[in-house]
Amino acid sequence: MSMKQIETLVFDYGGVIVNIDDASVVKAMESLGVTAFKRLIHVRKIKRLMHQYINGLVAESETLKEMLSLCRKGTTTEDIEKVLEELCGNLPVERLEALVKLRKQYKVYLLSNINDTLWQKSVCLMKQLGYSTDELFDEVFLSYAMRKEKPSVEIYEEMTKQTGLNPATTL
Protein backbone atom coordinates (compact mmCIF):
# COMPACT_ATOMS: atom_id res chain seq x y z
CA MET A 1 0.00 0.00 0.00
CA SER A 2 1.40 3.38 -0.95
CA MET A 3 1.09 6.50 1.18
CA LYS A 4 -1.25 7.88 -1.50
CA GLN A 5 -3.80 5.27 -0.45
CA ILE A 6 -3.51 6.16 3.24
CA GLU A 7 -6.15 8.53 4.61
CA THR A 8 -5.78 8.03 8.35
CA LEU A 9 -2.86 7.71 10.76
CA VAL A 10 -3.25 6.24 14.26
CA PHE A 11 -0.45 6.87 16.74
CA ASP A 12 0.36 5.42 20.13
CA TYR A 13 1.58 7.89 22.73
CA GLY A 14 4.13 6.12 24.95
CA GLY A 15 7.28 5.16 23.09
CA VAL A 16 6.06 6.70 19.82
CA ILE A 17 5.22 10.36 20.45
CA VAL A 18 6.81 10.58 23.88
CA ASN A 19 10.09 8.88 24.80
CA ILE A 20 9.86 6.59 27.81
CA ASP A 21 13.07 5.70 29.56
CA ASP A 22 12.33 2.37 31.24
CA ALA A 23 15.67 2.47 33.04
CA SER A 24 14.79 5.75 34.76
CA VAL A 25 11.42 4.36 35.84
CA VAL A 26 13.12 1.27 37.29
CA LYS A 27 15.71 3.46 39.02
CA ALA A 28 12.96 5.67 40.46
CA MET A 29 11.07 2.61 41.75
CA GLU A 30 14.24 1.24 43.31
CA SER A 31 14.69 4.57 45.11
CA LEU A 32 11.41 3.75 46.89
CA GLY A 33 12.62 0.31 47.89
CA VAL A 34 10.94 -1.64 45.09
CA THR A 35 13.95 -3.79 44.23
CA ALA A 36 14.29 -6.14 41.30
CA PHE A 37 13.62 -9.03 43.69
CA LYS A 38 10.40 -7.43 44.95
CA ARG A 39 9.30 -6.69 41.39
CA LEU A 40 9.92 -10.32 40.47
CA ILE A 41 8.00 -11.63 43.49
CA HIS A 42 5.09 -9.26 42.92
CA VAL A 43 5.08 -9.29 39.11
CA ARG A 44 1.52 -10.64 38.88
CA LYS A 45 0.24 -8.14 41.43
CA ILE A 46 1.99 -5.25 39.66
CA LYS A 47 0.71 -6.33 36.23
CA ARG A 48 -2.86 -6.67 37.52
CA LEU A 49 -2.66 -3.35 39.32
CA MET A 50 -1.27 -1.48 36.31
CA HIS A 51 -3.81 -3.15 33.99
CA GLN A 52 -6.68 -2.01 36.21
CA TYR A 53 -5.20 1.47 36.68
CA ILE A 54 -4.48 2.10 33.00
CA ASN A 55 -7.97 0.94 32.07
CA GLY A 56 -9.74 3.12 34.62
CA LEU A 57 -11.06 0.13 36.55
CA VAL A 58 -9.50 1.17 39.87
CA ALA A 59 -9.33 4.61 41.46
CA GLU A 60 -5.93 6.25 41.59
CA SER A 61 -6.08 6.34 45.40
CA GLU A 62 -6.52 2.55 45.49
CA THR A 63 -3.63 2.06 43.07
CA LEU A 64 -1.35 4.28 45.14
CA LYS A 65 -2.34 2.42 48.30
CA GLU A 66 -1.43 -0.93 46.76
CA MET A 67 1.82 0.45 45.37
CA LEU A 68 2.71 1.77 48.83
CA SER A 69 2.55 -1.80 50.13
CA LEU A 70 5.47 -2.68 47.81
CA CYS A 71 7.65 0.24 48.92
CA ARG A 72 9.88 0.66 51.94
CA LYS A 73 8.39 2.15 55.11
CA GLY A 74 8.18 5.90 55.10
CA THR A 75 7.31 6.14 51.40
CA THR A 76 4.43 8.52 50.73
CA THR A 77 1.86 8.67 47.96
CA GLU A 78 3.59 11.87 46.82
CA ASP A 79 6.81 9.87 46.39
CA ILE A 80 4.96 7.37 44.20
CA GLU A 81 3.30 10.14 42.18
CA LYS A 82 6.76 11.54 41.41
CA VAL A 83 7.87 8.11 40.20
CA LEU A 84 4.77 7.79 38.03
CA GLU A 85 5.64 11.15 36.48
CA GLU A 86 8.76 9.44 35.11
CA LEU A 87 6.35 7.55 32.86
CA CYS A 88 5.39 10.86 31.23
CA GLY A 89 8.80 10.69 29.60
CA ASN A 90 10.50 13.20 27.33
CA LEU A 91 8.31 14.86 24.72
CA PRO A 92 10.34 16.12 21.74
CA VAL A 93 8.71 19.23 20.28
CA GLU A 94 9.75 18.02 16.80
CA ARG A 95 7.23 15.18 17.06
CA LEU A 96 4.45 17.60 17.90
CA GLU A 97 5.45 19.76 14.94
CA ALA A 98 5.35 16.66 12.73
CA LEU A 99 1.83 15.81 13.91
CA VAL A 100 0.62 19.29 12.98
CA LYS A 101 2.09 18.86 9.49
CA LEU A 102 0.59 15.39 9.09
CA ARG A 103 -2.88 16.70 9.97
CA LYS A 104 -2.76 18.86 6.85
CA GLN A 105 -2.77 15.70 4.73
CA TYR A 106 -4.28 12.96 6.92
CA LYS A 107 -6.77 12.37 9.68
CA VAL A 108 -4.63 11.80 12.77
CA TYR A 109 -5.85 9.87 15.82
CA LEU A 110 -4.21 8.94 19.09
CA LEU A 111 -4.88 5.52 20.62
CA SER A 112 -3.04 4.87 23.86
CA ASN A 113 -3.02 2.73 26.97
CA ILE A 114 -2.68 5.44 29.62
CA ASN A 115 -4.30 6.48 32.89
CA ASP A 116 -6.02 9.79 33.59
CA THR A 117 -3.25 11.26 35.76
CA LEU A 118 -0.47 10.60 33.26
CA TRP A 119 -2.63 11.85 30.41
CA GLN A 120 -3.42 15.11 32.21
CA LYS A 121 0.29 15.61 32.96
CA SER A 122 1.06 14.91 29.29
CA VAL A 123 -1.55 17.43 28.15
CA CYS A 124 0.08 20.03 30.44
CA LEU A 125 3.47 19.20 28.95
CA MET A 126 2.07 19.66 25.43
CA LYS A 127 0.66 23.05 26.47
CA GLN A 128 4.04 24.08 27.88
CA LEU A 129 5.48 23.31 24.46
CA GLY A 130 2.79 25.44 22.81
CA TYR A 131 0.38 22.78 21.54
CA SER A 132 -3.11 21.53 22.35
CA THR A 133 -4.46 18.07 21.65
CA ASP A 134 -6.99 19.68 19.29
CA GLU A 135 -4.11 20.95 17.14
CA LEU A 136 -2.37 17.58 17.15
CA PHE A 137 -5.18 15.03 16.76
CA ASP A 138 -8.56 14.77 15.13
CA GLU A 139 -9.60 12.62 18.07
CA VAL A 140 -8.00 11.00 21.10
CA PHE A 141 -8.80 7.47 22.33
CA LEU A 142 -7.48 6.56 25.77
CA SER A 143 -7.73 3.19 27.45
CA TYR A 144 -8.81 4.53 30.84
CA ALA A 145 -11.72 6.47 29.29
CA MET A 146 -12.77 3.60 27.01
CA ARG A 147 -12.25 0.94 29.69
CA LYS A 148 -10.55 -1.15 27.01
CA GLU A 149 -6.89 -1.63 26.19
CA LYS A 150 -4.64 -2.38 23.28
CA PRO A 151 -4.12 -4.85 21.81
CA SER A 152 -7.71 -6.04 22.37
CA VAL A 153 -9.83 -6.13 19.24
CA GLU A 154 -12.58 -4.26 21.11
CA ILE A 155 -10.63 -1.02 21.44
CA TYR A 156 -9.89 -0.93 17.70
CA GLU A 157 -13.50 -1.78 16.84
CA GLU A 158 -14.74 1.01 19.12
CA MET A 159 -12.36 3.55 17.58
CA THR A 160 -13.41 2.47 14.08
CA LYS A 161 -17.09 2.72 15.00
CA GLN A 162 -16.72 6.19 16.54
CA THR A 163 -14.65 7.65 13.70
CA GLY A 164 -15.95 5.77 10.69
CA LEU A 165 -12.36 5.23 9.58
CA ASN A 166 -11.63 2.59 6.97
CA PRO A 167 -9.06 0.08 8.27
CA ALA A 168 -7.93 -0.55 4.68
CA THR A 169 -6.76 3.07 4.36
CA THR A 170 -5.40 3.44 7.88
CA LEU A 171 -1.81 3.17 9.02
What is each model feature region?
Residues 2-5, 104-105, 163-167:
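Glycine-rich phosphate-binding loop signature in dinucleotide/nucleotide-binding domains
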Residues 73-75, 130-135, 164:
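Short helix-capping segments at alpha-helix termini
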Residues 145-147:
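Short, acidic/glycine-rich phosphate-metal binding loop used to engage nucleotide
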Residues 4-93, 104, 115-121:
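N-terminal helical cap/lid subdomain that shapes the substrate entry/recognition surface
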Residues 38, 134-139, 167-170:
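Short acidic capping loops at alpha-helix termini that bridge into adjacent secondary structure
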Residues 8, 149-171:
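Conserved Lys-Pro-Asp/Glu-containing loop-to-beta segment of HAD-superfamily phosphomonoesterases
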Residues 26, 96-100, 156:
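Short amphipathic alpha-helical segments and helix-helix/interface helices
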Residues 94-141:
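Substrate-recognition/cap helix-loop segment adjacent to the acidic, metal-dependent catalytic center
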